[in-house]
Swiss-Prot record:
Protein name as annotated: Acyl-homoserine-lactone synthase
Pfam families: Autoind_synth
GO molecular function, one term: N-acyl homoserine lactone synthase activity
Organism of provenance: Pseudomonas amygdali pv. tabaci (Pseudomonas syringae pv. tabaci)
GO biological process: quorum sensing; signal transduction
PROSITE patterns: AUTOINDUCER_SYNTH_1, AUTOINDUCER_SYNTH_2
């Protein structure tokens, strides 16, 4: 029996317009309104130059109601670590065909609470879906810029990672550059933690369900050194 949860994958060019607009609207509510990040907002939407044809999106929903999302960009393409995040760290931004950057990761806990499903392992399911997609796409790792609190959440979910660098987004605001390896062990730990709170179904094992061709898989990379 279905749990009502579904995680879907689509590229910028193949995602249905209504779903893309919903995603941008949720990002505006979470990153601009709630967290007060200095992000680009236009009307009711949050989006920037990294929302483009090179971008892949993951969206999690319950009974058709979107609750969570993230975006992935292969590091062969322009991505945030070599753009707005470049001043945070001393290390160079990797250019590696087998590595993608995750950004705009969110779970709408307020919406989940209103639906009575806050107990569900939404963060773990979103991470599991990203790991599944990365493994099936031939990616070896995901990099991401996070707070210390988010790094702890990622590790608690079961995804072991390495801290490539520590920096500051602003005075006193520490951020970490994580490399999250795509491995069988991480897959099993993520799945095991989900199983503690949510039945593991055949549908879950197949997440994310592809809505179109993604753009974060390995490709020819002009600079392949990490």
């Amino acid at each position: 029996m279905s749990s009502g949860f579904e995680f879907q994958l689509a590229s910028y060019t193949t995602m249905p317009v209504t779903l893309l607009e919903t995603l941008y609207s949720m990002r505006k509510k979470i990153f601009s309104d709630r967290l007060e990040w200095k992000v680009r907002v236009s009307h009711a939407f949050e989006f920037d130059e990294y929302d483009n044809a090179a971008t892949t999106y993951l969206v999690g929903s319950w009974n058709g109601v979107p609750l969570a999302g993230l975006r992935l960009i292969n590091t062969c393409d322009p991505y945030m670590l070599e753009g707005p995040f470049r001043s945070f760290f001393d290390c160079p931004a990797p250019k590696n065909a087998a590595m993608a950057e995750s950004s705009r990761f969110f779970v709408d806990t307020a919406r989940a609470r209103s639906l009575g499903i806050l107990h569900a392992p939404l963060t773990e399911m979103l991470l599991f879906s990203m790991h599944n997609h990365a493994a099936l796409s031939g990616l070896q790792s995901i990099i991401t810029v996070v707070s210390k609190a988010m790094a702890r959440i990622v590790r608690k979910s079961g995804w072991e990672h390495h801290v490539l660098s520590t920096g500051e987004a602003s005075p006193g605001e520490t951020v970490l550059l994580l490399e999250m390896p795509v491995t069988a062990d991480n897959h099993q730990r993520l799945l095991g933690n989900i199983a503690l709170r949510q039945p593991v179904t055949d549908d879950l094992l197949r997440w994310p369900i592809a809505l179109g061709v993604s753009g974060s898989a390995p490709q020819a990379c002009m600079h392949s050194a990490a």
